């Protein structure tokens, strides 16, 4: 018996049971089906058991099944209630899928990013099954409408699903993108093991967390920003009260830090604007902002750090940390008005460091700390500056360092003098081992155009 025939046989029996059920039972079954599709273990296990019993009762247990499924029952479940051929990737059923952070379904073709390369997989998903899958996923998220053509959905295990269809795509070439986190232990030691940072950098970052600087995590898409912030935050003190604001429920902080009083809000754009005043009146020790990308998020971040808040953290899409303050200030002033110079000054004086991440060009699955920037503001000279503390050498797969400690950082460090001494010692040791020889300070010309009269000081 072919796999398709087995699936049809099981579906026929399930359809018969559905028709004989009363309205209450149907509603209950429908809710269970939704939860099974979204990956809830209890409901998924129940339907696997039902399918297994049908296969046994019908005497079709010797039927064929595709090699990407672990068993006939598992395959039938995923074809009817699961993610079809995507299931082995979504639930890490092979070593290569455990190493894969993203998958794309383009038309009926499935591509998985494995060791930094998008590989075409043997399993295909036809148009009818894709439409069934989209409808099933959207049933579990009532706010999403199939005709909208663009959707973002999250599975139970945290996988983010982005669906493009309808008029947004070419005929028969609808797209479903899946993203998952492959880092199992959110520790600096794990980042060292993966080669993202060097061992002494892990020690440095832990001391920086102890002191409590405000940090930006920057980089392009799929560079590891969110994961790095998760590692940083998971090393934070658990007795402090925090507030996490994101545009989508991507990071389950209640799971990652169950003992920490960390409130989680999902808001963006106008919703975020409406909440700003109440958020600023809160008594949180720090704030996390995931995916800052518009004027509302930029202004909220600035309002929070301008109150003297420490330990705040944010991720932002950029490959240019030096010009990031200008971009943020431009968006804020265009939307809300104000002085560009004043906003830029607040950014340089409020955020202490930018942790810049990247993927290696020869393997996009490998993440690296690309650079560590220090933002400084000299009030006596009304002069912001960006100092390159660390940079990654792609060819040598190593890092170079340059010691610098701004006066504003020293002031913050007075509350933790022992940690501050340790931080300075680590930075000097790193510089001595592998130094950046040239001058790396940049005085952004966008702050005061007259700096262009002495362009060698701008670094731009």
Indicate residue ranges for each PLM-predicted region:
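Phosphate-binding glycine-rich loops and their immediate beta-loop-alpha structural context
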Residues: 189-264
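NTP-binding/hydrolysis catalytic cores, primarily Walker-type P-loop NTPases
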Residues: 368-460
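Switch/coupling sub-region of P-loop NTPases
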Residues: 231-348, 357-359
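N-terminal accessory targeting/assembly segments
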Residues: 1-144
């Amino acid at each position: 018996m072919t796999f398709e025939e087995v699936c049809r046989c099981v579906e026929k029996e399930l359809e018969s049971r559905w028709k004989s059920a009363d309205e209450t039972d149907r509603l209950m079954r429908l809710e269970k089906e939704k939860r099974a599709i979204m990956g809830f273990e209890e409901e998924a296990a129940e339907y696997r058991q039902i399918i297994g019993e049908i296969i046994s009762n019908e005497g079709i247990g010797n039927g064929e099944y595709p090699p990407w499924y672990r068993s006939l029952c598992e395959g039938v479940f995923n074809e009817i209630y699961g993610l079809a051929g995507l299931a082995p990737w979504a639930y890490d059923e092979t070593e290569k899928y455990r190493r894969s952070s993203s998958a794309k379904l383009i038309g009926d073709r499935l591509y998985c990013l494995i060791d930094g390369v998008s590989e075409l997989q043997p399993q295909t998903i036809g148009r009818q099954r894709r439409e069934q899958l989209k409808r099933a996923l959207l049933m579990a998220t009532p706010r999403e409408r199939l005709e909208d053509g663009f959707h973002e959905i999250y599975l139970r295990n945290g996988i983010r699903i982005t669906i493009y269809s309808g008029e947004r795509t070419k005929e028969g070439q609808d797209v479903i993108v899946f993203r998952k986190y492959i880092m199992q232990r959110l520790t600096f030691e794990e980042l060292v093991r993966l080669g993202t940072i060097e061992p002494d950098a892990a020690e440095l970052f832990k001391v920086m967390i102890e002191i409590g600087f405000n940090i930006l995590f920057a980089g392009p898409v799929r560079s590891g920003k969110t994961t790095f912030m998760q590692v940083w935050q998971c090393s934070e003190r658990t007795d402090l009260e925090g507030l996490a604001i994101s545009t989508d429920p991507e990071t389950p902080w209640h799971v990652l830090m169950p003992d920490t009083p960390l409130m989680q809000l999902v808001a963006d754009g106008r919703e975020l604007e409406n909440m700003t005043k109440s958020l600023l009146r809160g008594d949180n020790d720090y704030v996390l902002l995931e995916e800052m990308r518009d004027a509302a998020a930029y202004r909220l971040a600035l309002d929070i750090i301008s109150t003297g808040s420490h330990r705040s953290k944010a991720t932002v899409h950029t490959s240019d940390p030096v010009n990031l303050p200008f971009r943020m200030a431009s968006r804020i002033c265009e939307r809300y008005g104000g002085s560009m110079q004043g906003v830029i000054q607040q950014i340089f004086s409020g955020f202490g460091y930018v942790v810049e991440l990247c993927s290696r060009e020869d393997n996009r699955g490998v993440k690296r700390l690309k650079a560590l920037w220090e933002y400084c503001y000299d009030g006596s000279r009304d002069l912001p500056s960006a100092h390159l503390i660390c940079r990654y050498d792609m060819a040598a797969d190593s890092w170079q360092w340059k010691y610098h400690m701004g006066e504003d950082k020293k002031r913050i460090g007075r509350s933790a003098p022992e940690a501050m001494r340790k931080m300075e010692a680590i930075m000097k040791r790193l510089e001595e081992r592998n130094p950046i020889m040239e001058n790396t300070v940049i005085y952004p010309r966008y702050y005061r155009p007259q700096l262009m009269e002495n362009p060698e000081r701008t670094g731009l």
